[in-house]
């Protein structure tokens, strides 16, 4: 058996450099056979053994395989069995196991065996314990009903068991050699391998470091260039922004200067025109009566000339009438004398009478023309007085020096002045458009309570107005404070006149023109009454209806507006500001004194009726020639239970009159609200 194993080991060996290998093999054979190393062998076997030793490359795997003894079998029994069966069986290498070991680990042969017995015995015991475990596993996993031997010929059960005990130690020893391969490797070779690997790794790392350092250097260089470029760009952007800012400032300054120059020219032209018109139409003078000084109007040359023409026409008319009377008296005297008159005499009497009639007709036409001129004079006088008042208010305003408010709005000329506010035409230097700046001022002599009340009132107006976006309602763009006593609201600018100026220039409007204006006003009111919180304007009058450059009517001034809460019933809301508003355009319920008035959108419906009536007939339906104090004192509106229509040329349609009657219904319960009025067929336009 030992000879066959020697042959098996020699076939797997590739190392021939170890000359002490025969002694080691002799010791191993002695252990396997239970004999001493000095036991003699046949010369033929020794010669074969020496020949095979020179071809060995590794003995560690063979040592581990041979030294492993299966549990339950002694060395003597194994050697005996081998001696008994060496003639019949030949021990061969497990080629399958060998292929697995070579494919998985590709083990190398150990060059020398540890000479110390203690270390050798320890490795032997470890191998035996591992071999026992492997044998038990193979017995459980590889048991079959019948098996065939790996040698030549058939084997008995004892032979199969023996072959299993021989093969199993080889596998276990191979595993042990794989796990302890590093233990049998020479320290020098291990250090040389590790050093070579470390040198290669070090070279690779140094190459990588050099490459990374080069990349870092390039990145830093690029970063420096980029930073330099960024700084240059930032400086350029800063310079451009500075230039742009300077350009904007220069542009704003140029625009502001041009606007101021134009406004100054307009102011001078307006004052020159007023002076010239004052000579023609009249001027305001001062009348002193004792200690009372009052302003009075002094008529101009135009009215004096018109009055002179009227007097002359009247005198001529009276003279002609006297001549006609004398002619008739002479004709009547001739008839009483009974004298016959010839036909020629009759013609002489008839012709003068026809001349007198013709002349009287001509005088009447001239008189009507002069009266029309006087009416036009009255309208021009009203416009002149309004312009004179505007100029006087502008001269007395503390904002008449063309300031720029909020670094944005350049004030130009005064448009008008109310009780506690001034409205200036201004230019928005940011959005580049004309706007109207309404300056709200607090009287320094007011009490703090009154100031707070006015501020709340103005803030409420702004809140209401800013939420309104409709093409028939003037927009509110902005709001800001000027000082402790003044703030400004910026409104949409309407370059056209207001309805009050239109009615002053023309006593009455054609029905077609008046109708389209009322339709636009009603559309704005419908918008106010379709919001989640309905709004009552409460101060509709000609001065609060503006026209833009295209003639579109827009409602403005929501200073007295009322917000109708959701919980208000059909009766409306309480009027808490009784006495405010313009009395000619307010309904009777606003003048009730015995109880708190209840109002609704029907207040605006009454105002629409008054506006429509005034546009068609040239005067208000109730209290036209009365002051507000007289209206309040004489209860003019409370007594206005029926509306009367004057005769006009051309005549007003019945549909227009019916709409006015419905709007001026005395009882609030019977009067339509805004949404109902808007459904009136007269206010609907349809394509023909």
UniProtKB/Swiss-Prot annotation:
GO terms for cellular component: cytoplasm; nucleus. This is Serine/threonine-protein kinase TOUSLED. InterPro entries: Kinase-like_dom_sf, Prot_kinase_dom, Protein_kinase_ATP_BS, Ser/Thr_kinase_AS. Oligomerization is required for activity. May be activated by trans-autophosphorylation. Higher activity during G2/M phase and G1 phase compared to S phase. Residues 409-683 form the Protein kinase domain. It comes from the Eukaryota. SUPFAM superfamilies: Protein kinase-like (PK-like). Residues 1-196, 326-348 are annotated as: Disordered. Its cofactor is Mg(2+); Mn(2+). Keywords: ATP-binding, Coiled coil, Kinase, Nucleotide-binding, Nucleus, Phosphoprotein, Serine/threonine-protein kinase, Transferase. The lineage of its organism: Eukaryota, Viridiplantae, Streptophyta, Embryophyta, Tracheophyta. Residues 10-19, 35-70 have a biased composition (Low complexity). Autophosphorylation on both phosphoserine and phosphothreonine. Homooligomer. Interacts with TKI1 and ASF1B/SGA1. Its main location: nucleus. The first coiled coil domain is essential for oligomerization. It comes from Arabidopsis thaliana (Mouse-ear cress). Residues 20-32, 111-137, 179-188 have a biased composition (Basic and acidic residues). The active site is at 539 (proton acceptor). Residues 194-253, 298-332 form a coiled coil. Its EC number is 2.7.11.1. Residues 155-164 have a biased composition (Polar residues). One of its GO terms (biological process) is regulation of post-transcriptional gene silencing by regulatory ncRNA. The keyword tRNA-binding does not apply. Most abundant in developing floral meristem. Also expressed in maturing flowers, developing seeds, mature leaves and roots. Barely detected in stems. A motif (Nuclear localization signal) lies at residues 97-100, 123-139, 389-392. One of its GO terms (molecular function) is protein serine kinase activity.
């Amino acid at each position: 058996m030992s000879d066959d194993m020697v042959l098996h080991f020699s076939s797997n060996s590739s190392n021939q450099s170890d000359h002490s290998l025969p002694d080691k093999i002799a010791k191993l054979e002695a252990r396997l056979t239970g004999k001493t190393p000095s036991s003699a062998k046949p010369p033929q076997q020794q010669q074969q053994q020496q020949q095979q030793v020179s071809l060995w490359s590794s003995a560690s795997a063979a040592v581990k395989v041979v030294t492993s003894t299966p549990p339950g079998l002694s060395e003597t029994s194994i050697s005996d069995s081998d001696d008994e069966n060496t003639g019949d069986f030949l021990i061969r290498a497990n080629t399958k196991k060998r292929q697995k070991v070579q494919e998985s680990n590709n083990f190398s042969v150990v060059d020398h065996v540890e000479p110390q017995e203690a270390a050798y015995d320890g490795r032997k015991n470890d191998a035996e314990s591992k071999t026992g475990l492997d044998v038990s596993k193979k017995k459980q996993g590889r048991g079959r009903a019948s098996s065939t031997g790996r040698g030549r010929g058939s084997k008995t059960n004892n032979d199969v068991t023996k072959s299993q005990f021989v093969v199993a130690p080889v596998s276990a020893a191979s595993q042990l050699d794989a796990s302890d391969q590093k233990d049998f490797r020479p320290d020098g070779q291990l250090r040389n391998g590790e050093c070579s690997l470390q040198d290669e790794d070090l070279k690779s790392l140094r190459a990588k470091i050099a490459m990374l350092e080069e990349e870092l250097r390039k990145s830093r260089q690029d970063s420096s260039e980029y930073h330099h470029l960024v700084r240059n760009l930032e400086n350029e952007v800063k310079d451009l922004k500075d230039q742009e800012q300077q350009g904007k400032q220069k542009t704003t300054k140029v625009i502001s200067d041009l606007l101021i120059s134009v406004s100054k020219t307009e102011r001078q032209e307006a004052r020159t025109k007023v002076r010239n018109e004052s000579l023609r139409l009249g001027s305001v003078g001062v009348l002193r009566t004792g200690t009372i000084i009052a302003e009075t109007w002094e008529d101009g040359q135009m009215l004096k000339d018109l009055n002179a023409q009227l007097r002359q026409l009247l005198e001529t008319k009276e003279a002609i009438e006297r001549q006609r009377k004398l002619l008739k008296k002479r004709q009547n005297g001739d008839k009483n004398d009974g004298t016959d008159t010839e036909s020629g005499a009759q013609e002489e009497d008839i012709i003068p009478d026809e001349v007198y009639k013709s002349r009287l007709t001509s005088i009447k036409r001239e008189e009507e023309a002069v009266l029309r001129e006087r009416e036009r004079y009255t309208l021009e006088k009203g416009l002149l007085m309004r312009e004179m008042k505007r100029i006087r208010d502008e001269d007395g305003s503390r904002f008449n020096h063309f300031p720029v408010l909020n670094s944005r709005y350049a004030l130009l000329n005064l448009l008008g002045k109310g009780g506690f506010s001034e409205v200036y035409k201004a230019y928005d230097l940011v959005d580049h458009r004309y706007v109207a700046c309404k300056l709200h001022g607090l009287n320094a002599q007011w009490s703090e309570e009154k100031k707070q009340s006015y501020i709340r009132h103005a803030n409420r107006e702004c809140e209401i107005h800013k939420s309104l976006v409709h093409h028939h309602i003037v927009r509110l763009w902005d709001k800001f404070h000027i000082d402790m006593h003044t703030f400004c609201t910026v409104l949409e600018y309407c370059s056209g006149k207001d309805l009050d100026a239109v009615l002053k220039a023309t006593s009455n409007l054609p029905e077609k023109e008046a109708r389209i204006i009322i339709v636009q006003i009603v559309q704005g009111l419908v918008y106010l009454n379709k919001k989640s919180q309905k709004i009552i304007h409460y101060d509709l009058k000609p001065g609060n209806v503006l026209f833009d450059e295209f003639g579109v009517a827009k409602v403005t001034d929501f200073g007295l507006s009322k917000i109708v809460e959701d919980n208000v019933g059909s009766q409306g809301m309480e009027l808490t500001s009784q006495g405010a508003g313009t009395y000619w355009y307010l309904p009777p319920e606003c003048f009730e004194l015995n109880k708190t008035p209840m109002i609704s959108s029907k207040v605006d419906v009454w105002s629409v009726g008054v506006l429509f009536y005034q546009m068609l007939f040239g005067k208000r339906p109730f209290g036209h020639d009365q002051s507000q104090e007289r209206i309040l004192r004489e209860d003019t509106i409370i007594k206005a239970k029926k509306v009367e229509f004057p005769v006009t040329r051309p005549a007003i349609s019945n549909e227009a009159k019916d709409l006015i009657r419905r709007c001026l219904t005395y009882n609030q319960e019977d009067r339509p609200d805004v949404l109902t009025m808007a459904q009136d067929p007269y206010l609907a336009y349809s394509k023909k």
